[in-house]
Amino acid sequence: MHRIAIALMGAASLTACSVGSDEGSTVPASGSGPTRAYAVEGFDRIAVAGGDDVDVRAGTAFSVRAEGPADELDKLRIAHDGRDLVIGRQKRVLGFGSGKGVKVFVTLPRLSEANIVGSGTMTVDRIEGTTFEANIAGSGDLNIAALTTDAAEVNIAGAGTLRAGGTIKRLEANVMGSGSLDAAGLRVGEADVTVAGSGNVRAAVSGRAKVELMGSGNVDLGAAAQCDVSKKGSGSVRCGR
C-alpha cells in the first residue's frame, strides 16, 4: 500500500506541475468574444486544471476551441509541450480558478493519456489503441464512452471519478482516498486493483484479478472474476459467484 500511495502522489504532483507552470509553448488564441480557436496539433495527451469542462472527440484532424464568457476566456491558457496539450490559466491568475462557464472542445486522432488536477470534467467519446493512462488528482471527473485498448492504467488520488465503458484486455487501477472507478460496463480480461481509503472500483472482469484493499472501500469485479484478495479494514470485495 505504501508503494501505491507514493506512486499516486508522484503522478498527481507531476501533473500539477505541468499544468500550473509555464512549461510548454503558449498557443495564441484567434477570435474574440465568447469563442476562441487555437492552432495546435501533434499531441496525444491532455492535461486539465481547475473547473473547466473539456469535450474530447476522436477525429482525423486536430482542433482546439473554447467557448464561454469573454473575460474568462482571456484568462485561459492553452499550451503545447511535446505530446501534451495543457489546459490551464495564465500565470498571473491566482489558483486554478473555477472556469465559470468555460468549455473547451478538442479533436485529435487518438488520446493516449488524460490528466485532471482539480474539479474539472473531461468527456471522451472513444479511445482505441495499445495503451491508455488516466490520472485524477482532486475531485475531477473523467467520462469515457468507449475504451478499447490492450491495457489501461487508472490512478485516482482524492475524490475524483472515472466512468468508462468498452473492452480492454488488462486493467491496473489504483485508488487512494474517496474516489471511484465506476466501470461496470467495462469488460476486462484481467485486472490488478488497489484501493486505500473509502474509494470504490467496479468493472466486469472475466479472468484473473489481484485485489488489495485497505480501508472502508468496496471492489466489485463481477461474477466471472477469479480473484486473489488481500484485505484489511471494513471494506468489501466481490469476485466470482
Indicate where each model-derived feature is located.
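Short, surface-exposed interaction patches in beta-rich subdomains
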Residues: L162-R241
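Acidic (Asp/Glu) and glycine-rich low-complexity loops/linkers
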Residues: H2-G10, C17-V117, T121-N135, A146-E153, ...
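Conserved acidic catalytic centers in enzymes
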Residues: G50, G138, G215
